[in-house]
Amino acid sequence: MYIINLLFRGHAVAIIYVTNQKHIADLKIYREKQKHRADMLVFVEDQKHRAKGDCLWFYTDQKHRADTIIYWEDQKHRADLKIYEVDQRHRAKGSF
């Protein structure tokens, strides 16, 4: 987890931009299919102002407005972080 803290440079994950260019991403993220294997349980907010902390995310189409740029990694062993998306806000947990 130390490397992830360095990549975030003190920013709480909240506003996320997804890129298809691995080399510009701050983090490579793998979507875990099983909740118990994930490093973090993430809830995706539908309103930007509600995305606070590490595990409450809001996706943006504007790269310059994002806190973090991520790349969806299809190989688990190449990912910096494994997440599982939960369907209820109170079930989100995890921090860097």
Spans of features found by a protein language model:
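Repetitive, compositionally biased segments used for assembly/scaffolding
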Residues: 2-96
